[in-house]
Amino acid sequence: MNASISLLCLALLLISPFCLGYSDEERESDSLRVAEIIRTSNDAESKINRTQELLDIFRRLTPTLSPEQREKIERSIQEHTDEILIDGVPSQGGRKTKYVGKILSPVAQGLAVGFFEELGGSLSRLFTG
């Protein structure tokens, strides 16, 4: 009995790295998704509405980035997003764009579109190396 439990634990330890993390397939899927988002977002409204999806992709990609890469993109994100608070405490990885679902002045709309283009470009460069 003790040997079977030990064997089971060993098997779980060997298998668990394959179940966790960001796989090559997920990375490829996100890379294609970023390219599609950038390619099909032709007007300001679609860019603003799809910014949150780019933020979600960045959140999934974050563990695979170097601290320098992560810091560079996070500085830009913090300028253009609001922190999600749950009971007054920041949510883990919880940021949302400031711009979705709001009526924006032309200046704010320009900022939102610029943020979309900056974030999309940064993600695209990360995927293409």
Swiss-Prot record:
Signal peptide coordinates: 1-21
Localization terms from the record: Secreted
Pfam families, sorted: Turandot
Entry's Gene Ontology cellular component terms: extracellular region; extracellular space
Induction: By a variety of stressful conditions including bacterial infection, heat shock and exposure to ultraviolet light.
Keyword field: Immunity, Innate immunity, Secreted, Signal
Record-linked InterPro entries: Turandot
GO biological process, one term: response to heat
Function: A humoral factor that may play a role in stress tolerance.
Family from the record: Belongs to the Turandot family.
Full protein name: Protein Turandot C
